[in-house]
Amino acid sequence: MAFNKLAPAVGFTVALAALRLASVGASAPPGNCTRECGGLEIPYPFGIDVEDGCQLSDRRQGFKLRCLDRGGRGKRLYYINQEVLEISLEHGQVRWLNNISSYCYNATAGEMEVNSPPSNMDLEGSIFRLSGTANKFTVLGCKTLAYIGDTDNITSYTAVCGATCKDGNLSLLTNGSCEGIGCCRTAIPRGLENYRVWFKSFSTRRCSYAALVEASNFTFSSTYLSSSAFVDAYGGQAPLVVDWAIGTLQGETCESARAKPESYPCVSNDSLCVDSPIGRGYFCKCKKGYQGNPYLPYGCKE
């Protein structure tokens, strides 16, 4: 009986604490938000687009994701058309799938042509930027020259990567090596928000491939040049990493965010703010020795 008398008082105390916490930081999401899609966790500040209040409010798009069943594969998590594979709060990153560009010979037309959805992307107006540390522009082929550049012609960024095979001899290729023989890869600058891929035409009938790919997830195989194994292995798409941050439109920093305590999102007592490596915005993380969600009250735990 003593427990029953105490329960209302405990509930009132917890509710009061939550109200006080909400008054000094960003509002916590409702407790009935969908936090899983297709077996993938959806941690706040991200949420499903049709559930109001379940994601952080930001003037740029990105925290609202979609949980859809496309092609009868069961529900998957998407940002627009990109299938999301993982969301990292600690590193301020998201992994998703992106198209691989295939450049193959068309016997009817008698020329090389791109025969798959291009490996292009435009993240303008979103919280995301292409990771310059996690991704590499990767090109596969013999007698292949592929380019990557921005789509807005503002930063005038262009890079080229070439792959060749001596006399077209695939037996000379080395599995695991991507140093220009059958495979080439190069870095991209930090903070890119868009890119496109194109090929230079050569007299060849082998398919060539190019994509911006998560470097740690790719290992070259000679079979990628003698067959469609590369495209088949990834279903026409390969993992890509994007950085994300809060307040990128306003160019906010941790200092400016702390100056507005009523909307400061790092609400866990054991959280800290980190200025984003993409140059604008910030994200929250748990202090060393703690794990969890820094965007939730008491979300960081030992």
Where in the sequence are the language-model features?
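Typically disulfide-stabilized, N-glycosylated extracellular/lumenal ectodomains of secreted
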Residues: 2-302
